[in-house]
Swiss-Prot record:
Keywords assigned by UniProt, alphabetized: cAMP biosynthesis, DNA-binding, Leucine-rich repeat, Metal-binding, Repeat, Zinc, Zinc-finger
Keyword Cell division: no
PROSITE patterns xref list: ZF_RING_1, ZF_RING_2
GO biological process, one term: cAMP biosynthetic process
Protein name from the UniProt record: Putative adenylate cyclase regulatory protein
InterPro entries for the chain: Leu-rich_rpt_Cys-con_subtyp, LRR_dom_sf, Znf_RING, Znf_RING/FYVE/PHD, Znf_RING_CS, Zyg-11_UBL_adapter
Superkingdom to which the source organism belongs: Eukaryota
Keyword Glycosyltransferase attached: no
Disulfide-bond pairs as recorded: none
LRR repeat extents: 184-206, 207-230, 231-251, 255-277, 278-301, 302-324, 325-347, 348-370, 371-393, 394-416, 417-439, 440-462, 463-485, 486-508, 509-531, 532-554, 555-577, 578-599
């Protein structure tokens, strides 16, 4: 055999066989010598070998003829058999109802370009079948922590991969040193992989544009090498051991646009990154040991997003005043941040997070931020002046959680574009009067607003979709709710004085209802009117004894009556043909006949029965059907 053969190729690099550079293993697999990663193990079948020898040309021709015949057979087929591939990946124990099968079906519809197997680690056993997907460009194996290294090495044979996600898997230094085989890779994520200590091998990925190594806490080598990747535009090293020395390895004239160093506690000085004029997104949240170089932030003229949450030495916005292109700014939990002077120059800001800035007392400087759409001032304990709020005419989202000094809802009545409002923990609010002008409001949170006594002012909010009400101890009547005809989700918790729940039964469009720790809730006869209900949670409502109309809720997918200790009847439970999740924990008053009806629920997947008297015969039948029991 002379020159390059036209009838065979190496199973690893997919290059045609060349005489003199091949080895034949006893398992009859042939590879280029340089492609054999482990010296005494076959990369294809992982069989251990006792010796290696040069491939015989005549035997190669015989193997190649068989290979070509197999290729002709495959070419004549209509495509890859999803069922067969699913069984191979799952070691033969996978059915057509498995998650692997569903993911493969989705990939087939996309012409096998994208395959997402994240979270399928409990089913995946053998990745060898992936070699048939030669067109695969995007693969996600995140959370598949049970796959051994020899299985993960199969991924390196998919030479057309552009994007690869391997979060929280068993990849290690050996895998990283071999990844250079993926010549076209542009996106790589190996977050949370504790076996990685040296990332020097990643520098062979000359086409790489985005790299994420978040939470790879054991990395000690290679930070300086990856910073030299010529095409790298996005680098994320959150919760790693990056130091000031590693920061100095980043070339100021590089192409980096996104840089994330959140919770890197070894970083103390930001001076080294001051020359990176190309940066558009920078995250330093949780880097609480930074004491130097904050003045360098003003040099990032192209910066669009900045997160310096938790910076203990940031006291004023003056160092940020030149970032005129900034659209997103987060300085949350900067305990010493007091002075907002300088923010008024950031006229392009869309989103501002000041939550947990205990020193902020006035919002006067935000009045000029006419483009602001989202503002979070939760937990600003010293805030007493809200004069700037009424001028934010484009504001759509406002979080005022735990701002105890906020008492007058009328101060925001002119914010007509408001879509989401969180007033949780504003315990001095006594009335919702003023909210009726926010006609576009879609989500409202009123948790811990203990002085509110009525919903009457918000009855006209027809666009409201989600309402959270918790620990409103003085709320006795739900009148006004019936007018919110567009409400889809209602969460009512700990309203112990409330006695009139009738308005809830008029919410014909509601899909999710949660009523927990409502001590006076007894009569649920109106439930039958909520025909579109998909999720119902009745938690800790001890006065409920029968629920005789539950069988009429044909669209119900999730039902929870946990810790309703006096519940004795669930009428029509067997008619809930769409029910997928059922929680009867702590319902010790239910009879055996109720539990027997569980065997008639065809779509049941999860059952919670802790603290209930569930017959053994029911548990055995549910286990046989593959129901997850807790």
């Amino acid at each position: 055999m002379t020159g390059r053969s036209t009838y065979g190729m190496c199973a690893v690099c997919r290059e045609p066989w060349a005489e003199g550079a091949l080895e034949l293993f006893p398992c009859r697999h042939v590879f280029c010598t340089v492609c054999v990663v482990e010296r005494w193990r076959c990369p294809s079948c992982q069989r251990r070998i006792g010796g290696r020898r040069k491939a015989n040309p005549h035997l190669l021709r015989e193997i190649a003829e068989v290979t070509m015949e197999l290729k002709r057979y495959r070419k004549g087929r209509s495509g890859i058999d999803v069922t067969q591939m699913a069984r191979k990946l799952g070691g033969g124990g996978v059915t057509t109802s498995s998650e692997i099968f569903r993911r493969l079906e989705g990939s087939k519809n996309g012409r096998w370009k994208i395959l997402n197997l994240s979270g399928c680690g409990s089913e995946l056993q053998d990745l060898t079948a992936l070699r048939d997907l030669e067109a695969l460009e995007d693969l996600d194996l995140s959370e598949c922590a049970n796959l051994e290294l020899r299985e993960l090495m199969v991924v390196l044979t998919l030479r057309n991969l552009r994007k690869l996600r391997m979060k929280r898997t068993m990849v290690n230094d050996m895998w990283c040193s071999s990844i250079g085989l993926l010549k076209f890779l542009v996106h790589l994520e190996v977050d949370g992989s504790r076996g990685v200590t040296d990332i020097t091998g990643l520098c062979r990925l000359k086409t790489l544009e985005a790299l994420s190594l978040d939470s790879c806490i054991n990395i000690t080598k290679g930070f300086d090498k990856i910073c030299a990747l010529p095409q790298l535009t996005s680098l994320s090293l959150c919760q790693t051991n990056v130091t000031d020395k590693d920061l100095r390895c980043i070339h100021p004239d590089g192409k980096l646009k996104v840089l994330r160093y959140s919770s890197c506690h070894e970083i103390t000085d930001l001076t080294a990154i001051g020359g990176m004029r190309s940066l558009e997104k920078l995250s330093l949240s949780g880097c609480w040991n930074v004491t130097k170089g904050l003045e360098e932030l003003c040099k990032f003229s192209n910066l669009r997003e900045l997160d310096i949450s938790g910076c203990l030495v940031l006291g004023s916005a003056v160092v940020l005043k030149n970032l005129i292109n900034l659209k997103v700014l987060s300085v949350s939990n900067c305990k010493n941040f007091k002075d907002l002077n300088g923010l008024e120059r950031l006229v392009n800001l869309d989103k501002l997070n000041l939550s947990g800035c205990h020193g902020v007392s006035s919002l006067g400087f935000v009045a000029n931020l006419s483009n602001l759409k989202e503002l979070d001032i939760s937990g600003c304990e010293s805030l007493v002046c809200f004069d700037g709020l009424q001028d934010l005419n484009n504001l759509e989202v406002l979080y005022l959680r735990d701002v105890k000094s906020f008492t007058n809802v009328g101060a925001i009545k002119n914010l007509s574009k408001m879509r989401e409002l969180d007033l949780s923990g504003c315990e001095r609010i006594t009335s919702l009067s003023g909210l009726e002008t926010l006609k576009g409001l879609e989500e409202l949170s009123l948790e811990g607003c203990g002085e509110i006594m009525s919903f009457d002012p918000i009855w006209s909010l027809h666009h409201l979709r989600v309402l959270y009400v918790s620990e409103c101890g003085n709320l006795e009547d739900l009148s006004g709710l019936e007018g919110i005809t567009g409400l889809e989700e209602l969460y009512l918790h700990g309203c112990r004085k409330c006695t009139n729940f009738g308005p809830i039964w008029n919410l014909r469009n509601v899909c999710v209802v949660e009523l927990s720790c409502c001590e006076n809730l007894e009569d649920l006869s109106g439930l039958q009117c909520l025909t579109g209900l998909e999720e119902l949670y009745l938690i800790g409502c001890e006065e409920i004894t029968p629920i005789g109309v539950v069988g009429n809720l044909r669209n119900l997918k999730c039902l929870s009556t946990c810790w309703c200790a006096n519940l004795k009847e669930l009428g029509g439970l067997d008619r809930l043909v769409n029910l997928e999740k059922l929680d009867l924990s702590g319902c010790c008053g239910l009879s055996s006949s109720v539990f027997m009806e569980l065997m008639s629920l065809p779509k049941l997947q999860w059952f919670y029965g802790f603290g209930s008297r569930v017959p053994d015969i029911v548990l055995e039948e549910l286990k046989r059907r593959g129901v997850h029991i807790f």
